[in-house]
């Protein structure tokens, strides 16, 4: 049996390492929010990004000294630059988590619903993951995770 080129590490193992800067796209709700809270409790500095500025600001109130925020929409062309700005604001990045995807039941197969889903889950994914991967490649590595 061949070994996989991918290394899967348990979350608790990641938290025990010296890494301490994470960026989470989609941290204002759901799994992204739970991961952000867990990382904060482990002493991490985090950068969070999402579309709703008010939700980002509300979340930052939990631990203002540990949280940087950036409003961005992964479907917009400027989102890669905004992610770069958040990385810079945080002073670097050791872990990147993309937790922003959408899905709808579309029983009538309305084209705009499907196109919006593709813009978020394909185009947005590509923008964010490419930006994070480029940062890690140029800065000696890191961990990239997608939900």
Task: Locate predicted features.
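Rossmann-fold cofactor-recognition segment
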Residues: 63-78
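Catalytic Tyr-X3-Lys loop
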Residues: 111-129
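Active-site loop of short-chain dehydrogenase/reductase
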Residues: 20, 92-94, 136-147
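Conserved glycine-rich Rossmann-like NAD(P)H-binding loop of the short-chain dehydrogenase/reductase
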Residues: 42-58
């Amino acid at each position: 049996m061949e070994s996989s080129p991918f290394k899967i590490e348990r979350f608790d193992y990641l938290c025990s390492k010296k890494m301490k800067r994470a960026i989470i796209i989609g941290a204002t709700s759901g799994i992204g929010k739970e991961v952000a809270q867990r990382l904060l409790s482990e002493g991490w500095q985090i950068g969070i990004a999402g579309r709703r500025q008010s939700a980002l600001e509300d979340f930052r109130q939990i631990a203002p000294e540990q949280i940087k925020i950036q409003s961005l929409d992964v479907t917009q062309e400027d989102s890669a630059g905004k992610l770069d700005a958040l990385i810079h604001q945080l002073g670097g990045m050791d872990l990147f988590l993309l937790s922003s995807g959408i899905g709808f039941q579309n029983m009538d197969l309305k084209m705009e619903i499907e196109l919006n889903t593709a813009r978020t889950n394909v185009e947005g994914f590509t923008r964010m993951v490419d930006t994070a991967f480029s940062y890690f490649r140029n800065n000696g590595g890191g961990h990239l995770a997608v939900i």
